[in-house]
Amino acid sequence: MSNKVVCVTGASGYIASWLVKLLLQRGYTVKASVRNPNDPTKTEHLLALDGAKERLQLFKADLLEEGSFDSAVEGCEGVFHTASPFYHDVTDPKAELLDPAVKGTLNVLNSCSKSPSIKRVVLTSSIAAVAYNGKPRTPDVVVDETWFTDPDVCKESKLWYVLSKTLAEDAAWKFVKEKGIDMVTINPAMVIGPLLQPTLNTSAAAILNIIKGARTYPNASFGWINVKDVANAHVQAFEIPSASGRYCLVERVAHFTEVLQIIHELYPDLQLPEKCSDDKPFVPTYQVSKEKAKSLGIEFIPLDISLKETIESLKEKSIVSF
């Protein structure tokens, strides 16, 4: 058990909530930042966690408000920076996504640079910052931590979320090099599994959409990973002294057709979409290396279990009923 003090930013989020849960379980004192500590949908599920009464402190902080993380990170040994904007339909990508992602990350790291107690920062990045380098991705291609997304590829294809994660991670590495901060990044793909927070998150919404009467399924192949593995990887990346650099987290890459097949086997009575959203050839799958992630002790919960946990969780929260 640990009696260390750590900070989790964006603590009400999907990954962060699980991270707070694991940290409290392990005996940490957690300073958790949220944008609005007075909003019960953002804090109630955190305050209900085991150990929260004794060891969870909430702080108000905003990604774009300079210095607003100073008090949250002060006196901490570790900082887990998970807060980041995520929208699909953006009208003004620069204002809505790019600036907040980069400025927010640098704002948190700047607060960290003022606190001498901090031993390591663990940054929640994304496979988005890894895999889009213009190289074709096919079933025999293995994406690993040496890949870096090319911002020009993102701009050409208008992949604004991908660009935001890429620029934020890149800015973070430059900043920590300059300031001598020890940082590790976790780069998960589509994160699914049980929800602790009461509101729907983006990746669970993708599953909800296909089980709740969507006419078509997307022509897309994604890497999939369980939220519990992602939260655990963050903890291990902080606790294991030799952890360094980036860690891709993907249990497997699957096209939506495979995802639907698994859901059909789990829930044979569910009406699922049978038609693809376009007539193009299916986007091929690819591989993502697990070597580094395994060095953190991650054993990878299989996709079928992750899908079942996601759907059972959506039912439990009455977000879907069947």
Curated annotation (Swiss-Prot):
| One annotated GO molecular function | oxidoreductase activity, acting on the CH-OH group of donors, NAD or NADP as acceptor
Query: Organism's domain of life?
Result: Eukaryota
Q: Which reaction does it catalyse?
A: 2-phenylacetaldehyde + NADPH + H(+) = 2-phenylethanol + NADP(+); 2-phenylacetaldehyde + NADH + H(+) = 2-phenylethanol + NAD(+)
The tissues where this chain's protein is expressed are given as: Highly expressed in petals. Expressed in calyxes and leaves.
- Key word Oxidoreductase present in the record? yes
Q: Where does NADP(+) bind?
A: K42, Y161
Cystine connections? none
Which keywords belong to this entry? NADP, Oxidoreductase
UniProt-listed Enzyme Commission number(s)? 1.1.1.-
Q: Give the family from UniProt.
A: Belongs to the NAD(P)-dependent epimerase/dehydratase family. Dihydroflavonol-4-reductase subfamily.
Sum up the protein's function in the record's words.
Catalyzes the reduction of 2-phenylethylamine to produce 2-phenylethanol, a constituent of floral scent in petals.
Q: Which PANTHER family match?
A: CINNAMOYL-COA REDUCTASE CAD2, NAD DEPENDENT EPIMERASE/DEHYDRATASE
Q: What is this protein called?
A: Phenylacetaldehyde reductase
Q: Which gene encodes it?
A: PAR
